[in-house]
């Protein structure tokens, strides 16, 4: 991703002597000096122009034409441009590439300017400070995050302070963590842009746009003052942030940077949330990836848990749902309150509520743009129309003492009558997209504007009347009175009628077949009409700016409403999903353990015709389940579904199970799948061991651990030894709730040593040479792994299968004769094994050829003649010497 540094105000010497440049280029270079590492969009008429190296870079990134026009300081000026009305699509592409763009607008009047028109940078668009709807994803929050790294003092450990802001939503959060937790927190927050000093940025492993700030930006005292000023308080004690020195340093740098990019204060940032790791069920990077919460293992958006659940009626709801899925809570009170609300909604008319919610606009983001004075006319009309629906939504929210959360939402959705009345009076029913086009302020809101509009809008009738009078006065029947933008108002007379033109007509334009004239009366009207139109647009722009200012005192009300609407939407959506998918309300309890009855994998269930539900029992006396069975038998699905049921329960949703009783959970760990990290220089086995080490160091008795085939990335001896030792450690030291899938059948002896371990297996049955997976979890270990049958299903060539079958038969016979375990003695016995190549396997016995021939016969699809021929072939195979 692109990296940027903070602005430094000096003219780059590479541009040559400053006084050798033209006045316009001097103006550009002054502006560019404030943004040396940022692309500058320099407004010139209807285009944004880029110059010098900015033009070259933009030409390459945007695939636009690079030209050279004129010269400055004796050299051609390289330039590239984009139409101002198409700027958003180009900005979107640049931001996606991690670039930042300074928007430089004309703020002076070209008609009165002496020299270059006055210009200034009105805002800087960076990946983390997007506010335009066209640049933002509807369903993902866009976070700007700052990192402050405070060195260790007096033997204390060094501290990392994090502060992150959803700029358009106005949500500011802070926390502190240790350096080794930094990447994990960045994976959780998923910022669009990170601010930090050089040393800190060099330690980050996460792929994200980075902006380098000097160390002095991260000052604790300055950060504390800046945050108090932003929140309008004398102390941060009430927020629980007064002692979080590293977080305060990060918050100060964050707020200053965000305000600088917007060119104004952040009026809507009026609250602060302090997060602590202990609030949430811990989900590390591997767990978020393996559970496919919002992204599949292949990096796709679907099918995931989020894509299954997100039938939200509003974008606000979708963003909140995504946040909830990544932040399951340890405290049972909030999830239980959500589940109570869902249960009450299911007993009411949640369908009507969802239908009404679908008509609403994105109040959260409109509020952010309003606070930044960048709200457009249709933002205001959408806000007005959404506010008008609040009484209806309140009526549709069921009220019950059994669901206090719904009562809170009802109160939060009170209509702000003053703000709504103002919007109703001020904004047209269907305003223009941009205020510069006019047609935004409603008639009756301002008498002066109405008068100017009347003059402008009555032009049509005046022209009709004038045309009729002039035809009668001159006797020219085809005389026309018209208007165009270039020549204004005129009277057009064809050349054949030129002799009838009166003396008071003054020629304005000559055409091939006609002449255009102006009269004193028409000129006077033109001056009045065009002046009225211009003055009306100016008046409307002024009124619109005043309207934005009048709405600012209502920001807190709008934010409250947006938060309540988002919650109502998510709860109604989870009710709809529970109804549609036959999910049940879980029971969250103090007693340790996980008891799931007929649980299903929420996503996989939707991808198959028939899903086999399974129970899962983890208690104090049954801490670890050793799961054996064939590949494709469902071991990984069983483990993942258990974790997803637990996660959904602590999100506050209903769960895909007939019943679920779940005790306290502090973290969910997963070690599933095989993947290397070539860029990081780590093999598959190294990745596996790194993840296993993290689990062994951090898992507690209240953690849920999923271990899938640990140790498979090395030799049999090493892998089995490690798997055995890891399972023992989880039982004796971590004592976590553990699902441990393995193909090492030797591990099934573990319950003989530890009473808290139990064997379960995924069942399968052989059918001829094939295998049928039953996907049912049963007590006890599996009898075999069915590896050859799975290989056959995968399409491994028959000669390879036959060779493997012969080698397996020898291993099993040797094991029976010596009492050795095939897995343990695999390498020790290598020298004693018979050598069987594929050619030997192909010709090994008539029985194998006969079996292959029989497998290829479909008796139901043969004629009598074909059946007789097949019988002769089989007889020949059975007695080849005949």
UniProtKB/Swiss-Prot annotation:
Keywords: ATP-binding, DNA damage, DNA repair, DNA-binding, Nucleotide-binding. GO terms for molecular function: ATP binding; ATP-dependent DNA damage sensor activity; damaged DNA binding; mismatched DNA binding. ATP binds at residues 629-636. GO terms for biological process: mismatch repair. Pfam families: MutS_I, MutS_II, MutS_III, MutS_IV, MutS_V. This protein is involved in the repair of mismatches in DNA. It is possible that it carries out the mismatch recognition step. This protein has a weak ATPase activity. PANTHER family: DNA MISMATCH REPAIR PROTEIN MSH1, MITOCHONDRIAL, DNA MISMATCH REPAIR PROTEIN MUTS FAMILY MEMBER. This is DNA mismatch repair protein MutS. It comes from Ralstonia pickettii (strain 12J). The lineage of its organism: Bacteria, Pseudomonadati, Pseudomonadota, Betaproteobacteria, Burkholderiales. The gene is mutS.
């Amino acid at each position: 991703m692109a990296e940027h540094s903070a602005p430094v105000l000096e003219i780059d010497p590479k541009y040559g002597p400053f006084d050798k440049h033209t006045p316009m280029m001097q103006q550009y270079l002054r502006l560019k000096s404030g943004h040396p590492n940022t692309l500058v969009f320099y407004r010139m008429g209807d285009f944004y122009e880029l110059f010098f190296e900015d033009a070259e870079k933009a030409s390459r990134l945007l695939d636009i034409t690079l030209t050279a026009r004129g010269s400055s300081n004796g050299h051609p000026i390289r330039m590239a441009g984009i139409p101002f009305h198409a700027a958003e699509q180009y900005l979107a592409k640049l931001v996606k590439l991690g670039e930042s763009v300074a928007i430089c607008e004309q703020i002076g009047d070209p008609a009165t300017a002496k020299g270059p028109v006055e210009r200034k940078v009105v805002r800087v668009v960076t990946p983390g400070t997007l506010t335009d709807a066209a640049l933002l994803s509807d369903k993902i929050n866009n976070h700007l995050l700052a990192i402050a790294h405070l060195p260790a003092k007096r033997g204390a450990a060094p501290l990392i302070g994090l502060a992150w802001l959803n700029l358009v939503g106005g949500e500011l959060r802070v926390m502190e963590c240790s350096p080794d937790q930094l990447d994990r927190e960045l994976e959780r927050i998923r910022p669009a842009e990170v601010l930090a000093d050089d040393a800190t940025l060099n330690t980050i492993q996460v792929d994200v746009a980075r902006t380098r700030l000097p160390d002095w930006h991260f000052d604790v005292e300055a950060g504390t003052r800046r945050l108090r000023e932003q929140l309008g308080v004398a102390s941060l004690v009430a927020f629980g942030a007064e002692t979080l020195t590293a977080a305060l340093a990060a918050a100060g740098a964050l707020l200053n940077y965000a305000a600088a990019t917007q060119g104004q204060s952040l009026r809507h940032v009026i609250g602060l949330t302090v997060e602590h790791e202990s609030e949430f069920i811990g989900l590390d990077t591997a767990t978020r990836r393996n559970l496919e919460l919002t992204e599949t293992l292949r990096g796709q958006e679907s099918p995931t848990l989020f894509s299954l659940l997100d039938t939200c009626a509003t974008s606000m709801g979708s963003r909140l749902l995504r946040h909830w899925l990544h932040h399951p809570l340890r405290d049972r009170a909030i999830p239980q309150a959500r589940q109570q609300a869902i249960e009450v909604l299911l007993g009411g008319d949640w369908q009507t509520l969802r239908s009404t919610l679908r008509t609403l606009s994105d109040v959260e983001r409109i509020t952010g743009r309003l606070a930044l004075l960048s709200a457009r006319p249709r933002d205001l009309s959408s806000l007005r129309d959404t506010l008008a629906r609040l009484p209806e939504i309140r009526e549709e929210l069921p009220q019950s003492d059994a669901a206090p959360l719904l009562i809170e939402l009802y109160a939060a959705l009170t209509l702000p009558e003053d703000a709504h009345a103002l919007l109703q009076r001020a904004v047209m029913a269907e305003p223009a997209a941009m205020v510069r086009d006019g047609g935004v302020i409603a008639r009756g809101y301002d008498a002066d504007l109405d008068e100017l509009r009347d003059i402008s809008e009555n032009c049509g009738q005046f022209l009709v009347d004038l045309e009729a009078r002039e035809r009668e006065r001159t006797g020219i029947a085809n005389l026309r009175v018209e208007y165009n933008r270039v020549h204004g108002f005129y009277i057009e007379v064809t050349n054949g009628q030129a002799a009838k033109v009166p003396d008071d007509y003054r020629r304005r334009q000559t055409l091939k077949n006609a002449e255009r004239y102006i009269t004193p009366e028409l000129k006077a009207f033109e001056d009045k009409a065009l002046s009225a139109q211009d003055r009306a647009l100016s008046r409307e722009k002024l009124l619109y700016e005043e309207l934005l200012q009048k709405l600012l005192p209502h920001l807190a009300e709008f934010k409250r409403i947006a938060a309540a609407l988002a919650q109502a939407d998510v709860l109604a959506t989870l009710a709809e999903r529970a109804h549609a998918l036959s999910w049940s309300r879980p029971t969250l309890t103090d007693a340790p353990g996980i008891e799931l009855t007929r649980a299903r994998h929420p996503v996989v269930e939707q991808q198959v015709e028939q899903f086999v539900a399974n129970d899962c029992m983890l208690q104090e006396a049954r801490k670890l389940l050793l799961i054996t069975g064939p590949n494709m038998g469902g071991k990984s699905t069983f483990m993942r579904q258990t974790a997803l049921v637990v996660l959904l329960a602590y999100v506050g949703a209903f769960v895909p199970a007939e019943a679920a009783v779940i005790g306290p959970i502090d973290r969910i760990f997963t070690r599933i799948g095989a993947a290397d990290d070539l860029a990081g220089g780590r093999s598959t086995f190294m990745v596996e061991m790194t993840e296993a080490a993290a689990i062994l160091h951090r898992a507690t008795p209240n953690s849920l651990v999923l271990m899938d085939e640990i140790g498979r990335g090395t030799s049999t001896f090493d892998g089995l030894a490690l798997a055995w030792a890891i399972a023992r450690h989880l039982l004796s030291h971590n004592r976590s709730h553990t699902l441990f899938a393995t193909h090492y059948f030797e591990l099934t002896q573990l319950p003989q040593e530890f009473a808290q371990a139990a064997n379960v297996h995924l069942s399968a049955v052989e059918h001829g040479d094939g295998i049928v997976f039953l996907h049912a979890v049963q007590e006890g270990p599996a009898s075999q792994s069915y590896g050859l049958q799975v290989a056959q299903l995968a399409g491994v060539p028959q000669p390879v299968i036959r060779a493997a079958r012969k080698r397996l038969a020898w291993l099993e016979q040797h094991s029976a004769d010596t009492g050795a375990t095939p897995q343990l003695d695999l390498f020790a016995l290598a020298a004693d094994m018979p050598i069987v190549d594929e050619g030997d396997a192909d010709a090994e016995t008539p029985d194998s050829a006969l079996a292959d021939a029989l497998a290829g016969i479909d008796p139901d699809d043969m004629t009598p003649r074909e059946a007789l021929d097949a019988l002769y072939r089989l007889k020949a195979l059975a007695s080849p010497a005949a």
